[in-house]
Amino acid sequence: MSVTLDLSRVSSDAAPATPVTKPLINLSGLTRPQLVAALVESGVVEHGKAKMRATQIFRWMHHRGVTDFADMSDVAKETRARLAEAFTIARPEIVERQVSKDGTRKWLIRMAPGIEVESVYIPGVGRAGALCVSSQVGCTLNCSFCHTGTQPLVRNLTAAEIVAQVQVAKDDLAEWPSDKEDRQLSNIVFMGMGEPLYNLGQVADAIEIISDNEGIAISRRRITVSTSGVVPMLEKLGSTTQAMLAISLHATNDPLRDVLVPLNKKYPIAELMAGIRAYPGLSNARRVTFEYVMLKGVNDSPEEARALVKLIKGIPAKINLIPFNPWPGSDYQCSDWATIEAFAAILNKAGYSSPIRTPRGRDILAACGQLKSESEKVRASALRKLSLAAMAGVLSDDDEDETA
């Protein structure tokens, strides 16, 4: 016996299907050429006027900082209405804002349900102040000294979500319009959650937007991208972004770096150094920054300091020495201050600038290693971290000369 089902018949009591609404594209994440294309493809602006309109809209978003198309007074009302129907320029939700006694500011930003990242503004770093931004939600690197870096990768951030971190900071710092002479935000460091070179396409677009002179206008020489050493992507990073390069080094030999930075097993030190030496634009005016966390009895001996000098010989560089901030369950301790100073003295004698940076924002849990343990007690669903280097003050006082 066969049975035939008539699937065309639906009960009159059945609820109608809910249409799936496609999220609006956030124009804040589009470079100017991408913005031109989006305006034409959407039919909001005719081709002949698209370039002019794109520049107007771009300036309103990134120079004036508006969050509503209705505020774009030199754009026709009809065009503004069509823009609002097709796109958005809204900011993400700020879940939490904290300000440290030392002026450090931290924002917990919800990009989407379950997608939260932290950004930190550190005053007095670089020319005026630096913002540490994230490029991914979660991380795949599993660096053994990093409490927060062991969290699983959720997804890459979009260019709009990266740029939004800058916009949120500028909102809070009252930094609009972007050409204010007394701006407090002068530098951007990609040292938050994630490995930027595993999301280079979106990172590169964000850098183009942030550095565009019609908008936020932060020079590419004041934008630093930190990597644990994704060697095949170094050349592309330099050629497409012209950003300053920072390397999370932390060891001078492969056996130790394999433990501290497991990515080293894939791209060992010799390969990493070759990639750094070939980095586009590397010069005394565009030095690479080596980040080196000071771990007691692990990588802090005078022999290690001399090995570091030998390793980077001939590379225009500076070394940021970062005191380790212990976290519960960690196998590591911070080097004694005298040990750190002795390490720095060896580097300085060899001609390398080697500032020692102490953590900033400890009272708002913005110091290295505090973010995962303390934040998860409050909000277990949030997957976020800020890099060790940024919290220790990635840029030294002499960076103003390099990034002017």
From Swiss-Prot:
CC cofactor note: Binds 1 [4Fe-4S] cluster. The cluster is coordinated with 3 cysteines and an exchangeable S-adenosyl-L-methionine.
UniProt xrefs under CDD domains: Radical_SAM
Active site, UniProt feature: 118 (proton acceptor), 368 (s-methylcysteine intermediate)
PROSITE patterns listed in its UniProt record: RADICAL_SAM
EC number(s) per entry: 2.1.1.192
Cofactor: [4Fe-4S] cluster
Localisation: Cytoplasm
Name of the protein in its database record: Dual-specificity RNA methyltransferase RlmN
The organism of origin for this protein: Caulobacter vibrioides (strain NA1000 / CB15N) (Caulobacter crescentus)
Gene name for this UniProt entry: rlmN
